[in-house]
Amino acid sequence: MSTKRRSYESGHKPKCLVVVDDTAECDRAVYYAARWAVRVGGGVVMLRVIEADQRNQEWRGVADIMRAEAHEEANAALDRASGRANGLAAITPERVIREGNPTQQILDVIEKDVDISALVLAASTGAE
């Protein structure tokens, strides 16, 4: 289902969604999103997706510890990316942590936030 974007309507401001991951290209995506936000007078939403791990589900305590560690790592990655955006453009991005399939979580965040008007993904320029 497609939701009408409201980012440029009165009372709304455009937002750019940037996916924060562990790739070297992520810094370029954060850079672009921060500069875009300044240029259009918008905001940035930073998303970190924790992929659900089906292993150790029968060991509930182990799964809980692994989940807590994944959330700590996600917060640390968002701290770094938010700090970079703030240093580049003096903005404070919104931070979102989701669990599950990355593609589905990206689509879900876009669907639920009608102010998101751009998705920034960084890509390698190499042969990988």
Each predicted region: which residue ranges?
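Small/aliphatic-rich secondary-structure junction motif
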Residues: 5-60
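Conserved acidic residues
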Residues: 14, 116-117
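A short acidic, amphipathic alpha-helical/loop segment
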Residues: 32, 108-109
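A short acidic, glycine-rich active-site loop
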Residues: 63-76
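Rossmann-fold cofactor-recognition segment
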Residues: 92-95
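Charged docking surfaces used in two-component/phosphorelay signaling
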Residues: 97-105
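Glycine-rich phosphate-binding loop signature in dinucleotide/nucleotide-binding domains
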Residues: 109-116
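Glycine-rich, Arg-bearing micro-motifs that act as flexible, cationic patches
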Residues: 118-128
